[in-house]
Design a protein with these regions (language model features):
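Amphipathic, interaction-prone secondary-structure segments
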Residues: 1-34
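Acidic, low-complexity intrinsically disordered segments
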Residues: 37-104
Length: 104
């Protein structure tokens, strides 16, 4: 099993994407397509929250066609980040993080 490592910067956050194709021969045999694994981790700042994960780390499995239709691991993750960054919850969290807290 090969592993691809992709490094990107999104909104000033350095992010590592690990992509492992075809992680389960049993899945491929049962469903006729490979099951791929994606890991996304914010590196700098370390474990910085992202619109797709509050902890700065995400690990999920996807059928190969999802990865391919998204344009590959990097394009797919960038599209997710941009899409979920438009959510009202993410926008509110970003505003809150930028404001000073006088009581802590």
């Amino acid at each position: 099993m090969t592993k691809e490592r992709h490094n990107i910067t999104w909104n000033g956050i350095q992010i590592e994407i690990l992509y492992r194709p075809d992680t389960s021969p049993a899945f491929r045999q049962s469903y006729g397509r490979p099951l791929d694994h994606l890991e996304v981790c914010s590196l700098a700042p370390e474990r910085e929250p992202l619109p797709i994960t509050e902890t700065g780390y995400l690990s999920q499995f996807y059928a190969r066609n999802v990865i391919e239709e998204g344009g590959g691991p990097t394009a797919l993750v960038l599209a997710w980040l941009d899409y979920f960054a438009q959510s009202p919850i993410w926008k509110a969290q970003q505003i809150s993080r930028q404001q000073l807290d006088l009581f802590s």
